[in-house]
Design a protein with these regions (language model features):
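Conserved, charged catalytic cores of large soluble enzymes
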Residues: 177-197, 205
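Acidic/His metal-coordination segments adjacent to aromatic residues that form catalytic metal sites
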Residues: 124
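Short hydrophobic/aromatic segments of transmembrane alpha-helices and their interfaces
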Residues: 3, 41-44, 199-202
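Membrane-helix boundary connector in multi-pass membrane proteins
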Residues: 118-121
Length: 303
C-alpha cells in the first residue's frame, strides 16, 4: 500500500482559494467601475481601473488557475504514476521550494502591480526580476514532473500526464520568448533599476506578444484543466473514459492547432495578411480538437 503525501497539494489548494477570492473580488470591483466610472477615484491612483485590471487578470490566471493546476499535479501524479513524494526527499524538497517561491512571486506581483510597475504587455505585465523568479519555479515544476515520472511504478502514462507535460513545455517556451527584455538601468545607467524594455519592437513585438497572449490561455486555462477533468471525471462518475483514442487524437490536435491561432488577435493590424488569415483559419479548425475533448467528457458522464 502506497502512502501518498498531499502536503504540497494542500498548500497549493489553500493558495487557489486565497488568490481566487482576491482575484475575483477585484473583478467584481472592476465590473462596478465600468458601470459607475466615478468609483475609479475612491482610492486615488491605487483604485483606478488601469491599476486593478492587471491585478485581476494576473491574480486569476497566475494566482488562482496556476495554484489549482499545481495542486492537481501534486495530487494526480502520485496516484496515476503509483509513487509517493515521500519516497524521494529530493523531489519533496523541490515541491516545497516550488510552492514557497511561487507564493512569494504572486505576493510581489500584487505589490508591484498596485504600485503601477508594469511592462504594459497584456498578461505579461511582471517586470524582469519577477520574470526570473517565475522561470526558477517553473523549472522546479519541470524537475518535479520528470522526476516523478522517472521513479514511477506505473509504466503507462495516463492522458492527464501528457497534458501536464505539454503545459510545462509550451508555457516555458512562450514565457521565455515573450519576456525577453532589457533592464534599462543595467543597459544605460539611467532610470529605475526595475524598469525594462522589450527586445522586440513594433509589429514584431505585437506578433510575439499575441503568440504568447493567446497561448497563455491555451496552456494555462485549457490543457491542464483537461488534465484535471480526465482524472476527476471518471473517478467521481465511476465511468471509464468514453474513448481513450479520442482523448489522444484531441490532445495532438489541440497542440498542433492552438499554437497557430494567435494571429486572430491582430486582425486588420500591420502583421502580414497571410498570418492574419492563418490565425483565423486555425481558430476555426480548433473546433475539432476542442469538441473532441468536450464530447469525450460528455459521453463519459453519460456512461
Amino acid at each position: 500500500q502506497i502512502e501518498y503525501d498531499y502536503s504540497v497539494a494542500k498548500a497549493f489548494t489553500f493558495a487557489t482559494i486565497l488568490f481566487g477570492i482576491i482575484g475575483m473580488t477585484i473583478g467584481v470591483v472592476l465590473a462596478f467601475q465600468l458601470a459607475f466610472p466615478e468609483l475609479n477615484y475612491l482610492a486615488g491612483e491605487y483604485g483606478t481601473f488601469s491599476r486593478l485590471r492587471p491585478l485581476h487578470t494576473n491574480g486569476v490566471a497566475f494566482g488562482f488557475a496556476l495554484s489549482g493546476i499545481f495542486a492537481g499535479w501534486y495530487y494526480i501524479s502520485q496516484r496515476v504514476l503509483k509513487v509517493s513524494l515521500k519516497e524521494s526527499p529530493f523531489l519533496m524538497a523541490i515541491a516545497k521550494l516550488h510552492f514557497v517561491l511561487y507564493f512569494i512571486t504572486i505576493l510581489l506581483a500584487v505589490v508591484t502591480l498596485f504600485m503601477g510597475i508594469t511592462t504594459s504587455k497584456e498578461y505579461a505585465e511582471l517586470e524582469w526580476p519577477l520574470d526570473i523568479l517565475v522561470v526558477v519555479w517553473w523549472v522546479l515544476w519541470g524537475i518535479s514532473i520528470f522526476g516523478i515520472i522517472g521513479i514511477r511504478r506505473e509504466r503507462t502514462l495516463y492522458i492527464s500526464i501528457w497534458y501536464f507535460i505539454s503545459t510545462f513545455i509550451a508555457v516555458a517556451m512562450l514565457y521565455l520568448f515573450n519576456n525577453m527584455e532589457v533592464p534599462t538601468y543595467l543597459a544605460t545607467g539611467y532610470g529605475s533599476w526595475i524598469h525594462s524594455v522589450s527586445m522586440y519592437s513594433g509589429t514584431n513585438d505585437a506578433l510575439v506578444q499575441w503568440w504568447y497572449g493567446h497561448n497563455a490561455v491555451a496552456f494555462v486555462f485549457t490543457t491542464p484543466i483537461i488534465a484535471l477533468i480526465y482524472y476527476f471525471l471518471p473517478k467521481e462518475s465511476g465511468q471509464n473514459v468514453y474513448s481513450y483514442k479520442l482523448s489522444i487524437l484531441a490532445f495532438w490536435g489541440l497542440l498542433f492547432v492552438y499554437l497557430w491561432a494567435g494571429g486572430h488577435h491582430l486582425i486588420y493590424s500591420t502583421v502580414p495578411d497571410w498570418m492574419q488569415t492563418m490565425g483565423s483559419v486555425m481558430s476555426v479548425v480548433l473546433i475539432l480538437p476542442s469538441w473532441g475533448s468536450a464530447i469525450n467528457m460528455l459521453l463519459t458522464m453519460k456512461g
